């Protein structure tokens, strides 16, 4: 293992990464900015990796919203260990951690969250990467989009929100699967690499038990994709 400490770019906060494991991309930061915080939110981060989505979300909102708390769910123990180190490094006491398969989330988490964040594997099946630990972060080898939707519905309170992103060409599938588990899409935002380019990502906010009505936000240009 080769651990490095990187800047989050907010208030001097830092995150612990491992160069031998999957490292976060700009997509995670986009999702943390897309998701909306409310006072008292109890937040779950599914497929958390080293925790960048939840940590960045907390950094953005900790001074604006009160009593935020988090549980990070991650299958790979080495990545979960990194997130624990990051929480300790930054003095974050609002974070708990849960290992194991997302499909086997403990009963104690049933309807206990007001917000679920999820940056999931984008690609369907097929193991092509020499490093299995990195491959399962990119491909649906250990969890599928439908399993994520089902688990999010299980974990969310009525009226709770799911903020999730995926490849733009999976929009129809995402809407269908979310609705199947009583998660109504309320906000939609495409992400493109440059102005006028075809979107490559889609970010959705869905509400458990919400009424049908969606707000389509302006396409977001990801400056990182232009560098």
Enumerate the predicted regions with their spans.
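Conserved Class I SAM-dependent methyltransferase catalytic core
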Residues: 20, 143-203
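A generic structural signal for alpha->beta connector loops
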Residues: 12, 67, 92-94, 159, ...
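Conserved SAM/SAH cofactor-binding pocket of Class I
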Residues: 34-129
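Residue-level signal for inorganic ion chemistry
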Residues: 31, 119, 148, 206
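SAM-dependent Rossmann-like transferase core, predominantly class I methyltransferases
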Residues: 3-42, 48-60, 205, 219-221
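Mobile active-site "lid"/loop adjacent to the S-adenosyl-L-methionine
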Residues: 120-147
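General small-molecule cofactor/ligand-binding pocket signal
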Residues: 16, 71, 96-98, 186-189
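Flexible, glycine-/basic-rich loop-and-beta segments that form/coincide
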Residues: 195-227
């Amino acid at each position: 293992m080769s651990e490095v400490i990187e800047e989050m770019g907010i208030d001097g906060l830092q995150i612990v990464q491992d160069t031998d494991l999957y490292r976060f991309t700009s997509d995670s930061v986009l999702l943390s900015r897309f998701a909306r915080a409310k006072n008292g939110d109890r937040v779950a981060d599914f497929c958390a990796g080293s925790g960048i989505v939840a940590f960045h979300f907390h950094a953005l909102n900790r001074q604006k919203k009160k009593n935020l708390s988090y549980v990070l769910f991650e299958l790979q123990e080495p990545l979960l260990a990194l997130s624990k180190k990051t929480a300790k490094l930054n003095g974050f006491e609002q974070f708990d951690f849960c290992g194991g398969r997302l499909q086997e989330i403990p009963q104690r988490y049933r309807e206990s969250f007001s917000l679920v964040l999820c940056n999931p594997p984008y690609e369907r099946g097929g193991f092509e990467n020499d490093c299995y630990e990195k491959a399962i972060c990119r491909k649906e080898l250990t969890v599928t989009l439908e399993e994520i939707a089902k688990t999010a519905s299980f974990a969310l309170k009525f009226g709770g929100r799911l903020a999730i992103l995926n490849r733009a060409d999976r929009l129809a599938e995402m809407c269908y699967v979310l609705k199947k588990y009583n998660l109504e899409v309320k906000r939609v935002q495409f992400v493109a690499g440059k102005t006028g380019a075809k979107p490559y990502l889609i970010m959705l906010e869905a509400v458990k038990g919400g009424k049908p009505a969606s707000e389509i936000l302006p396409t977001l240009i990801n400056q990182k994709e232009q560098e």
